[in-house]
A protein has these predicted regions:
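Active-site helix of classical SDR
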Residues: 125, 161, 169
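Short C-terminal tail/terminal secondary-structure segment
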Residues: 2-7, 96-99, 150, 226, ...
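Canonical Rossmann dinucleotide-binding motif of NAD(H)/NADP(H)-dependent dehydrogenases/reductases
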Residues: 7-40
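Alpha-helical segment proximal to the catalytic Tyr-Lys
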Residues: 130, 174-178, 246
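Substrate-binding pocket helix/loop in short-chain dehydrogenase/reductase
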Residues: 100-102, 106-114, 218
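Short, small/polar-rich loop/turn modules that mediate ligand/substrate recognition or access, typified
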Residues: 85, 177, 182, 248-250
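Residue(s) in the substrate-gating loop at a strand-loop-helix junction
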Residues: 145
Length: 262
C-alpha cells in the first residue's frame, strides 16, 4: 500500500457520532459518509434530526438526550440492531455552558455542563468499548477543545470539562491499547459558526463593547488570525481513521491555527 493509499480511511467503517445532526457533528457525519462509512448519529434536537434524515437519506438518526444514561444505552441498542457492531465512536456532543465569573455561575449550570460534556463521554465510551474490542479498526475519538490545553476565564465549567476529556482520553489510550483500540482527542480552536457567534455576543454584552470589536479580539488570539472551520476538524478526524494513523493513539491534537491564549 502506497503512502497516498494509506491516507484513505478504512472502507466500510461503522461510525457512531453523538451530537451528530448539526454543527461540527453534521460536518463529521458528512465527511464519513463521503468516505464510504456507515453512519449513525444521535442528537437531542428532533428538528435537526429530521433535517439530517432529509439531507442524508438512508442514514440512521436517533434522538437522545446525552444527559440521560438510559437514552445513551438505547442508542447502542439501535447501533447493534442496525449495524451489528461499531468501529468508530466520535464522542462529540457538548454544550457551551455559562459565560460569567465563577461567583455568578450557579450549581445547576455547573452540573449541567459536567453532565453533558464529560459524564456523557464516559457513558458513551463505557458502552462502546465492548463493540470496539470486536472491531479490527477500533477507534475512540473524543472531541474536546483548545480550552482543554489553556485556561479560559469566564468559561470555567466549559474549560474544566475539556481538560477532563483529555485526561479521560489519555487514560483510555493506555487502558485499551492492548486491545488494539486507538483513542485520541481533537481540540478544535475557535470554530466559525452560530455557536461561536453566540459566545462572542454574550461576552460582548457582558463587557459592554460592540460585537464586531469582540470578534476581532478573538481573532487576535490566533496566530493565523482566522477561525477554523468544521471541515478542518473533519479532515483530521478522517485521517485518524486511516491506515496512516494506525500508530497514533493517546494524542490530543489541536486544530486551531495556534490559539495563543483565551
Amino acid at each position: 500500500m502506497s503512502v497516498l493509499q494509506r491516507l484513505q480511511p478504512y472502507p466500510g467503517l461503522r461510525v457512531l457520532i453523538s451530537g451528530g445532526a448539526a454543527g461540527i457533528g453534521e460536518v463529521l457525519a458528512a465527511a464519513y459518509l463521503e468516505a464510504g462509512a456507515q453512519v449513525h448519529v444521535c442528537d437531542v434536537s428532533e428538528p435537526a434530526l429530521a433535517a439530517f434524515r432529509d439531507k442524508y437519506p438512508g442514514t440512521v438518526a436517533t434522538r437522545a438526550d446525552v444527559s440521560d444514561a438510559a437514552q445513551i444505552e438505547a442508542v447502542f441498542k439501535v447501533q447493534h440492531e442496525h449495524f451489528g457492531g461499531l468501529d468508530v465512536l466520535v464522542n462529540n456532543a457538548g454544550i457551551a455552558g455559562p459565560t460569567g465569573g465563577i461567583d455568578a455561575i450557579s450549581d445547576a449550570e455547573w452540573q449541567a455542563t459536567i453532565t453533558v460534556n464529560l459524564t456523557a463521554q464516559y457513558r458513551f465510551a463505557h458502552h462502546a468499548v465492548p463493540m470496539l474490542k470486536a472491531s479490527s479498526h477500533g477507534h475512540l475519538l473524543h472531541i474536546a477543545s483548545v480550552a482543554g490545553r489553556l485556561g479560559y476565564a469566564w468559561r470555567t465549567p466549559y474549560a474544566a470539562t475539556k481538560w477532563a476529556i483529555v485526561g479521560l482520553m489519555k487514560s483510555l489510550a493506555s487502558e485499551l491499547g492492548e486491545s488494539d483500540i486507538r483513542v485520541n482527542a481533537l481540540l478544535p480552536g475557535i470554530v466559525e459558526g452560530p455557536r461561536m457567534d453566540g459566545v462572542i455576543r454574550a461576552r460582548a454584552e457582558q463587557v459592554g463593547v460592540p460585537e464586531a470589536e469582540m470578534r476581532q479580539e478573538y481573532l487576535n488570539k490566533i496566530s493565523l488570525r482566522r477561525m477554523v472551520t468544521a471541515e478542518d476538524v473533519a479532515a483530521m478526524a478522517l485521517f485518524l481513521c486511516s491506515p496512516a494513523a494506525r500508530n497514533v493513539t493517546g494524542q490530543a491534537i489541536s486544530v486551531d491555527g495556534n490559539v495563543e491564549y483565551l
